[in-house]
Design a protein with these regions (language model features):
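Mid-to-C-terminal alpha-helical segments outside catalytic/metal-binding sites
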Residues: 2-50, 59, 63-76, 251-265, ...
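Active-site gating loops and adjacent loop-to-helix segments of metal-dependent hydrolytic enzymes
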Residues: 38-44, 71, 96-98, 163-170, ...
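A cross-domain feature marking catalytic cores of carbohydrate-active enzymes
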Residues: 50-54, 80-82, 103-107, 128-132, ...
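Active-site environment of divalent metal-dependent phosphoester hydrolases
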Residues: 55-58, 83-87, 108-111, 136, ...
Length: 312
């Protein structure tokens, strides 16, 4: 039996977002999300999603995405398998406000450098989601790819933390330890023109992820995946992990924001129909952690918009 990570996460997130009776003083995810919509029912301001996987099996995926994009005022950094690079590049050319092309490559492929060069030539703006590596992310054999990304000034999205097992009846050369958030620190320091983005905030190594982001201006994380589902009843714990709001810092932050939470960006990593549900989970975390309104806007799109030079 095989199940994709996104299928698993979509099902668990949906279960977590079933209507329930709110406790006294507790704001539900739906209530939190509704507060930040304008009169049209769309989110107040552009949402930029770092973590939307192009589905090669859905012939109507672009059309389906555009409907969701219009409803949610959403721009997607569309994570694209190399085999679909031209399809998504063409779509991004037609719909530049909705689709920003990002390319998935296998870091262990013998022609990976040529693949990255081709993606750049097609107008891709970054790489991701890099995952299932045969060596730790900071292995020198991967440096030629990072050198190119550094030259291009790209965002590179790495899977971090635990990863779903897809095959149970045959061997897999997969290990979460190769994808720990601690490996991103060296990449960020060696290649300062890369914006290093870790998916899933290192789940379950949130504190390592947060501290690496704290001291490196070019490191951010998303909270996609199972974290906001499993932490549903204790979202305020993130305030302990992202603890340094208002403290003096040597590293720069987007717009000089002093909230520790500005080191997060929005990522959904789910089926199209569930993206608004993940938005609700983020807003519930904002409420539980008293994240300032200005910082919320940076997380939900402001930071990525500035990094990519997207028009307001």
């Amino acid at each position: 039996m095989s199940i994709s990570r996104r299928q698993f996460l979509a099902s668990t997130a949906a279960a977590a977002m079933l209507p329930d009776a709110p406790c006294r003083g507790f704001t539900t995810m739906k209530q939190a999300s509704e507060r930040e919509k304008d009169a049209s029912g769309r989110p107040d301001g552009r949402v930029v999603d770092i973590h939307v996987h192009f589905d090669e099996k859905n012939a109507n995926y672009i059309e389906d995405f555009l409907k969701v994009s219009d409803r949610l005022n959403l721009t997607a950094l569309m994570l694209t398998p190399f085999s679909s690079r031209k399809v998504v590049a063409e779509a991004a050319g037609k719909y530049p406000k909705q689709i920003i092309p990002f390319g998935f490559v296998d870091l262990d492929a013998p022609d990976v450098v040529k693949q990255v060069e081709e993606l750049h030539g097609l107008g891709y703006r970054g790489l991701g989601e890099l995952e299932f590596v045969k060596k730790p992310y900071n292995d020198p054999s991967y440096f030629p790819v990072y050198e190119l990304a550094n030259r291009y000034g790209w965002i590179v999205l790495f899977h971090t933390g635990i990863v779903l097992r897809q095959k149970f009846d045959e061997p897999e050369d997969v290990a979460s330890g190769r994808m720990r958030p601690i490996h991103l620190e060296e990449i960020a320091r060696r290649f300062p023109k890369i914006t290093v983005l870790g998916a899933h905030c290192g789940n379950p190594e949130y504190e390592w992820a947060a501290e690496i982001a704290r001291w490196n201006s070019n490191v951010f994380f998303d909270l996609s995946g199972s974290s906001l589902t499993k932490m549903h009843g204790r979202l305020a714990d993130f305030k302990r992990i992202f603890w340094w709001s208002g403290q003096p810092q040597d590293s720069k932050t987007p717009d000089g924001d002093t909230s520790a939470f500005v080191k997060l960006v929005f990522g959904s990593d789910t089926d199209l129909q569930n993206i608004d549900g993940v938005m609700g989970q983020y807003h519930a975390m904002f409420e539980a952690c008293d994240v300032p309104g200005r910082t919320r806007k940076m997380i939900m799109g402001g930071t990525l918009g500035k990094l990519l030079g997207l028009p307001d």
